[in-house]
A protein has these predicted regions:
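A conserved ligand/cofactor-binding region detector
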Residues: 2-839
Length: 839
């Protein structure tokens, strides 16, 4: 008798008759129970007639069935944490780029086989069902993906945690390419609902905005303050379970959605003012519509500030509400029960908001409230770029958050007194460290607020942390050296190796066992197999299959046909001048120029693949996308060239198609200007999948090169010290252009319209920027980069040697697991320990 009877394909017209009915359909982990659960959800949750069922309905039913099992663990995890009084990490982030969750949750629950068996019995294909899941639009790039990796690792390491963020209704935009230009389209990811989230309308908090601060004397004669709001809105919680791998721990991601306090004004409706009847609802819900509204206009800037305050206030009120429910703890024990981490500067207003809640609403005195606040918060800095260290115009801040500004002034006054005491007579230092910026128009420096209000500050790569201490936060490091540390970023090997690269996962499991899924250092066991010719061939077979898979996707998405036998050279990341996608393009044009000048020239065939989004208001980044696509159009259509090089820009790069991209790369482009990339995580995702890196000594590249060995890394470019020296001497990019005939010829090809149908205007801003400004030293690094690319081509010709280097990149990637990073945060900053959960 089979484990699961073969039911009709609709899954409804007859109930499955499993051989073993002992497992409950809501909680059972076997194929039989799962099949019953899917059938139940198809009937009772989806409610479609059998004849109308499609793969997307099976996706939703399977997701709901998997969520049931996660909720069982979620409730147990919460209860265990409360019963034992364990400390919980709260991770505040404006982004959580979770990616499709069904495959990841099946992996972590170890239910992939059960799901495949159950769906097959119902006439469905698991891969087709997985493909139906939309990409949740909750993040923009590396920051949000890091937050998602960290939630995965917290659960896998059995550390109690809550992620807090915003439930963006439309999220990041969908990117389309029209005539080579990026066009932003609405990302309507919630159009069919989200089966993973559970709405919690009873978990809601009022958030104030505008108005004024009022000072009064209470009945005991104590002077107090309160915030009289000009406007109120309500935040409603939506909970998504986050399952750890191979454990019962299931944490939660709580996202806040904005609602009107009174959604419908009946009086206005009855008088015929139909817009006024719903005006408050429309205005309030705008707050959580879109991630990172364009902050060029004043209204966009205000909306960004409101978004940040909104989710921070809801989150802190929720944390304090949990504290109130704990029988054995009061608000004064907050730092012993919760560690709150600020993921970059977006949640920095939390410092002032927690003080307000403790002083104005809980009536603690300043000193006690301040000690609690500093002991509760940790701050992760993710950038060295000045524009990303958020500041808010003082006038706007005062109008929006009047009580917070008063609190910040008091923080600043007391803080600067400390600075004066430690560094007497140093007025310049006071001006540099002040939370209130006095240069030009006054502003509130959010990175300074986060630094002053946190007991721990960390960078995200060794070089980045050193640069923070030496430049951006130098004065603060000299003030409190004990607060600073480094926590190099990491990525989850569950999603970005096991899930994204099933062929390599199978090979790794056969070779070193499956322990690497939770201990990535075990991949060191691959090193003896580097000299095994049979293993190297298996490695190449896996890589070629992954390249064929990506080539199929690229063809469908762009119409560009790629040969899987070619070198796949890939750069996928947010489009930004400091990431230097245009340096990559200059090399492609140089190859084009060489091939056109010398028809007898033969080079190793290479496919250049790009992906990434530009911020809607970022003029130069959008022009770089146009240049990539224009060069692709010219190169791909030229028979003299297209037998050696092809170029493709994959639109709408996201976690879902990243599963195809990272495993297929032979060469990973990590070519930012030294000193500009805090860490990077895409570099790590390529590395664990066996790509070789061409890169500068920037961000985590430095540590990756240390781990894999310089002989297995293609290094080029100025170091951070050399970048500073070049700038100090008065950098003149035209000197580099004039001194390099090929670079001059490449820029001339762009300027005279070779890639723009003769239009000499379209790329002139980019050419002028490189020749006369070049803030990210593209011209200075060009010769070194092109020479390094020639070394790449030479290395590619020796397939056996390249394969050895590829294996070693994977074998030596253990440091870059998010499990290692989270263990360091838990041990060094949060003091959050493992908690076994039983179900």
């Amino acid at each position: 008798m089979t484990d699961v009877d073969q039911t009709p394909a609709d899954g409804l017209s007859a109930s499955p008759r499993p051989a073993d009915l002992t497992e409950h359909s809501r909680t059972g982990m076997g194929a039989a129970a799962l099949q019953r659960a899917i059938a139940d959800h198809l009937r009772y949750s989806i409610g479609r007639p059998a004849a109308a069922l499609r793969p997307e309905h099976y996706y939703r039913a399977l997701a709901l069935a998997v969520r049931d099992r996660m909720q069982d663990r979620r409730v147990a995890s919460t209860q265990t944490s409360l019963d034992l009084g364990r400390k919980v990490t709260c991770y505040l982030s404006a982004e959580f780029l979770m990616g499709p969750q069904l495959g990841n949750n099946l992996l972590n629950l170890r239910m992939e086989g059960a799901a495949k068996t159950a769906l097959t019995a119902m006439g469905q294909n698991l891969d087709e069902v997985l493909a139906c899941e939309p990409e949740p639009g909750l993040g923009n790039g590396g920051l949000g993906r890091l937050a998602a990796c960290y939630l995965d690792s917290l659960a896998t390491l059995e550390r109690p945690a809550i992620g807090y963020g915003i439930r963006y209704e439309f999220g990041i935009f969908n990117q389309q390419i029209q005539d080579g230009w990026q066009v932003e389209k609405t990302d309507n990811w919630l159009v069919n609902g989200n089966p993973w989230e559970i709405a919690k309308p009873d978990v809601n908090y009022l958030v104030k905005w505008g108005g004024y601060a009022e000072h009064y004397t209470d009945e005991a004669g104590t002077e107090r303050s309160r915030w009289v709001a000009g406007r109120l809105l309500k935040g409603v919680a939506y909970d998504t379970p986050v399952q750890g791998y191979g454990v019962n721990t299931c944490n939660v991601l709580t996202l806040w959605s904005a609602r009107a306090v009174e959604s419908f004004a009946l009086e206005a409706f009855n008088t015929g003012d139909y817009y006024k009847a719903v005006e408050d609802e429309v205005t309030s819900e705008t707050v959580t519509k879109v991630i990172y509204p364009n902050d060029e206009p004043e209204a966009g800037k205000r909306l960004r500030l409101l978004q940040q305050h909104f989710f921070v206030s809801c989150s802190l009120q929720h944390i304090l509400h949990i504290m109130d429910d704990l029988a054995d703890a009061g608000v004064r024990e907050l730092p012993e029960r919760f560690a709150v981490q600020l993921n970059d500067t977006h949640p920095a207003i939390a410092v002032a908001e927690l003080l307000r809640l403790l002083i104005d609403e809980r009536h603690l005195d300043w000193d006690e409230a301040w000690d609690i606040t500093v002991a509760t918060f940790g701050y992760t800095n993710h950038t060295l770029l000045p524009e990303a260290l958020e500041t808010w115009p003082l006038e706007m801040f005062s109008e929006s958050l009047p009580r917070h500004l008063e609190i910040i002034y008091e923080i600043n006054h007391r803080f600067l007194d400390e600075v004066r005491a430690k560094f007497p007579g140093d007025g310049d230092r006071l001006r540099r460290m002040s939370i209130i910026g006095e240069d030009g128009n006054k502003n509130v420096r959010m990175a300074h607020l986060a630094t002053v209000g946190s007991h721990a500050i960390n960078g995200v790569a060794a070089l980045h942390s050193d640069l923070l201490k030496a430049s951006v936060l130098k004065d603060f490091y000299e003030m409190w050296p004990e607060r600073f540390s480094n926590k190099t970023n990491g990525v989850t090997p569950r999603r970005f190796l096991a899930l994204a690269n099933p062929g390599l996962r199978e090979l790794l499991d056969r070779t070193v066992g499956d322990g690497w899924l939770t201990d990535l250092d075990r991949l060191r066991g691959l090193e003896p197999f580097v000299e095994d010719a049979s293993f190297r061939q298996q490695w190449r077979d896996v890589k070629r299959n992954n390249k064929a898979r990506l080539a199929k996707y690229v063809l469908s998405a762009t119409g560009v046909e790629l040969n899987p036998n070619w070198l796949f050279d890939i750069q996928v990341k947010r489009i930004h001048e400091y990431k230097r996608q245009h340096l990559n393009v200059l090399h492609i044009i140089a190859l084009y120029h060489r091939l056109k000048q010398n028809p007898e020239l033969s080079i190793p065939p290479r496919a250049f693949i790009f992906g990434g989004k530009a911020a809607p208001g970022y003029f130069m980044a959008k022009r770089i996308i146009k240049l990539i696509n224009s060069v692709a159009e010219t190169v791909n259509a030229d028979p003299d060239v297209n037998k050696f090089i092809k170029v493709a820009f994959v639109p709408n790069f996201n976690v879902k198609n990243a599963h195809l991209v990272y495993p297929a790369a032979n060469l990973s482009e990590q070519i930012s200007t030294a000193g500009k990339e805090a860490s990077g995580t895409g570099n790590m995702k390529f590395m664990i999948n066996g790509a070789l890196t061409i890169g500068t000594l920037d961000g985590a590249n430095v540590e990756m090169r240390d781990e894999v060995g310089g002989e297995n890394f293609f290094l080029f470019g100025l170091t951070e010290d050399e970048v500073q020296a070049v700038k100090a001497q008065g950098y003149c990019p035209s000197d580099y252009v004039d001194g390099n005939k090929e670079l001059s010829a490449v820029l001339d090809l762009i300027a005279r319209g070779t890639f723009s149908h003769g239009d000499t205007d379209v790329f002139m801003p980019l050419v002028d920027n490189l020749c006369y400004d070049d803030p990210f030293l593209v011209c200075a690094d060009y010769a070194s980069y092109v020479d390094c690319q020639d070394r790449v081509s030479a290395a590619w010709l020796d397939g056996e040697s390249w394969t050895k280097m590829s294996i070693l990149n994977t074998a030596r990637s253990g440091k870059f697991s998010s499990d290692r990073a989270i263990a360091e945060y838990c041990d060094d900053i949060w003091q959050v320990w493992p908690l076994k959960v039983t179900v």
